[in-house]
Amino acid sequence: MCDDDETTALVCDNGSGLVKAGFAGDDAPRAVFPSIVGRPRHQGVMVGMGQKDSYVGDEAQSKRGILTLKYPIEHGIITNWDDMEKIWHHTFYNELRVAPEEHPTLLTEAPLNPKANREKMTQIMFETFNVPAMYVAIQAVLSLYASGRTTGIVLDSGDGVTHNVPIYEGYALPHAIQRLDLAGRDLTDYLMKILTERGYSFVTTAEREIVRDIKEKLAYVALDFENEMATAASSSSLEKSYELPDGQVITIGNERFRCPETLFQPSFIGMESAGIHETTYNSIMKCDIDIRKDLYANNVLSGGTTMYPGIADRMQKEITALAPSTMKIKIIAPPERKYSVWIGGSILASLSTFQQMWITKQEYDEAGPSIVHRKCF
């Protein structure tokens, strides 16, 4: 299928925070840009500047000082379809420079998403972009493909949603899927809040992007939260400095590990939910007793919010505490896990056995958007 660029499938992983897009068969996405649409807050006065009424992705990011930034995908669910269409248009025509009507397109979504969401995705792909064929795959399943396994439990945590999906011999076990609407964006918001306690005020949508950068560069997961808090209180060894875009330097201490600790203790942001170690355990316990051993031994991490240093060791420690004492527990944290959903999509869309799985334009015309529930698990 990949002998020429004419018929190569496109793989587009629409995350709440980043869009990862490229061609099936490639080993990494060609385009990675923020899922942001920005609109000017001010009136344009310079004639001939060619100001636009909206900016997408990196361009919106670079002009953020004069824009209001909006994310069309919240908690993995597309909430603003007009903006989402702009993002897809930008992906096809500006980033990948392809005509979507010539390429089958694989999209991704979070498990347990509303049915209407995938129907609308299908409808826009066929009716607005005229793709010849498309498919919607579950993100966590693709991550498992990328790790070269058919059995395991995936903890996929991105910017908008975190979920545990147990998969056995290639089958996702829907009754055991755990979904947690707490992910990278909530951690960024929490970091904004606790930095305010230090006297640094971050409020606007543009400043949130600065805090996200602080989080990505400096945050880490503590192996033992109480110990780490004590260390931070007694010495300044954990403090790091960060230079803001205007040259001001701020110092950040225990916020570095208090921020991602929320994943293990959602009560930090007032959520009643269990932490990611407990949802993983609960998900395994909802599976058949015979397959739990294989799941414990194949805990695969995926998504940008699993990129914190120390997260794998902490997961190992927490799950070991919950599991039976003789159980062998292994956490797999591939270095490329930030993009493993996309990589899995690239693998899937280039398999010869997958080619009969596409929803074709003809099938869509006959059955309408609801075909997506029959063809895509």
From Swiss-Prot:
Q: Where in the cell is it found?
A: Cytoplasm, Cytoskeleton
Return the SMART domains for the record. Answer: ACTIN
Select a single GO molecular function from the record's annotations and give it.
Answer: ATP binding
**A Pfam family matched in the record:** Actin
Q: What is this protein called?
A: Actin, alpha skeletal muscle 3
What CDD domains would the database entry show?
A: ASKHA_NBD_actin
Please report the PTM annotation for this entry: Oxidation of Met-46 and Met-49 by MICALs (MICAL1, MICAL2 or MICAL3) to form methionine sulfoxide promotes actin filament depolymerization. MICAL1 and MICAL2 produce the (R)-S-oxide form. The (R)-S-oxide form is reverted by MSRB1 and MSRB2, which promotes actin repolymerization.
Q: What else is known?
A: Xenopus contains at least three sarcomeric alpha actin genes that are preferentially expressed in either heart or skeletal muscle. Due to the tetraploid nature of Xenopus laevis, each of these three alpha actin genes is present in at least two copies.
Species annotation? Xenopus laevis
| Tissue expression per record | Shows overlapping but distinct expression patterns with other actins. In tailbud embryos, expressed in embryonic muscle (myotomes). In adults, expressed exclusively in skeletal muscle.
**InterPro entries of this UniProt entry?**
Actin, Actin/actin-like_CS, Actin_CS, ATPase_NBD
The record's comment on protein family reads:
Belongs to the actin family.
Sites of Tele-methylhistidine modification: 75
Q: Which EC numbers does the record give?
A: 3.6.4.-
Instruction: Spell out the reaction equation it catalyses.
Output: ATP + H2O = ADP + phosphate + H(+)
Quaternary structure, from the entry? Polymerization of globular actin (G-actin) leads to a structural filament (F-actin) in the form of a two-stranded helix. Each actin can bind to 4 others.
Q: What class of enzyme is it?
A: hydrolase
**Is the keyword Nucleotide-binding assigned to this protein?**
yes
